[in-house]
Amino acid sequence: MKEKNDVQRAVTALLDELAPERVLKRAERLPVPVEQYRTPSGCVLQAATAALSVSWFPDPTADAPLGELHVIVWRGVVSRRGAPPRREPATVTGELVLLPVEHPSDASVWRAGDGTTYDTDSLAARCLALLAEQMAADPAAGPVK
């Protein structure tokens, strides 16, 4: 049980790093090159022509007893829940599936399929780099902030 709680804290820390919870404000927000959206189980970073989604699947499976984290890179605009479908749906250009490290001996709490391990900061940086790479493939997307 303690490990599941530790993993949930790591997920929350990653989501807070990538897309902090919004505070209600009276003024209208100005558009930025990358919009950040939180979902109940993840977040979406949306640029003009590229996006990155992070989704946490906490239910245990035989291969992932502590759950799985999916990082997906998209070309286009990802439809948000409740929004009408887009004429041109976004397409997946890359995916990274990570598992929590059981009993980590250091700060690394995530392991990719290729064995690469990440702590929260390095995984957030990797996510932003993946989004920047996809945005660079379409210069109209603008820089990652």
Spans of model-derived segments:
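Ampiphathic alpha-helical segments that act as solvent-exposed interaction surfaces
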Residues: S79-K145
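Acidic-enriched, low-complexity/disordered segments with a strong bias for Aspartate over Glutamate
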Residues: D6, D16, E28, D59, ...
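Acidic/proline-rich low-complexity IDRs
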Residues: A13, V44, A51, P65-E68, ...
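Amphipathic, interaction-prone secondary-structure segments
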Residues: L30-R86
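Residue-identity detector for threonine
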Residues: T12, T39, T49, T61, ...
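Charge-rich, low-complexity N-terminal segments
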Residues: M1-V44
